[in-house]
């Protein structure tokens, strides 16, 4: 997994078959914010085109795409394959750095946070889980970066 060399604005993505959750962070604060969802396109090319518009509109320099790694080593899921193909489609459209980041249990954690911490009903959680999962993915990635000490 490579570390970004000069990323300034980040887009976190939680890919799903129905919805794609989005989160945003930019230097110098790197405060991660959920920015909503987009509907997954009928195919990966349409989803990549919709994401590319967001990349351009927010001047994104680094995309952190949640990679749904299996809980057991050696297994490979169809969703993991779709994420890899989505990354390839994005690379065809944009020169931004695309990083596949371990997102195991991010949606489960987001769902739990919305239910237990926020007390939201299943109906109220719908649509919020994906962008919160994207926020958790992006925050996890940013937390892994070396901290810059400024005095």
Curated annotation (Swiss-Prot):
UniProt family annotation: Belongs to the YqgF nuclease family.
Predominant location: cytoplasm
Annotated TM spans: none
GO biological process, one term: rRNA 5'-end processing
Organism: Chlamydia pneumoniae
Signal peptide (from-to): none
Protein name as it appears in the record: Putative pre-16S rRNA nuclease
Enzyme Commission no: 3.1.-.-
SUPFAM superfamilies xrefs: Ribonuclease H-like
InterPro entries per the UniProt record, alphabetical: RNaseH-like_sf, YqgF, YqgF/RNaseH-like_dom, YqgF/RNaseH-like_dom_sf
Keyword set includes Isomerase: no
């Amino acid at each position: 997994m490579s570390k970004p060399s000069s990323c300034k604005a980040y887009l976190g993505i939680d890919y799903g078959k129905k919805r794609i959750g989005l989160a945003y962070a930019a230097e110098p604060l790197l405060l991660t914010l959920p920015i909503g969802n987009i509907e997954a396109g009928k195919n990966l090319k349409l989803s990549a085109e919709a994401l590319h518009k967001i990349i351009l509109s927010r001047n994104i320099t680094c995309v952190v795409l949640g990679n749904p790694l299996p809980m057991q080593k050696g297994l490979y899921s169809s969703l993991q394959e779709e994420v890899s193909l989505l990354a390839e489609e994005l690379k065809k459209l944009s020169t931004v750095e695309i990083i596949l980041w371990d997102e195991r249990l991010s949606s489960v954690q987001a769902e739990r946070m919305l239910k237990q911490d926020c007390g939201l009903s299943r109906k109220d959680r719908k649509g919020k889980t994906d962008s919160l999962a994207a926020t958790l993915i992006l925050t996890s990635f940013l937390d892994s970066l070396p901290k810059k000490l400024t005095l």
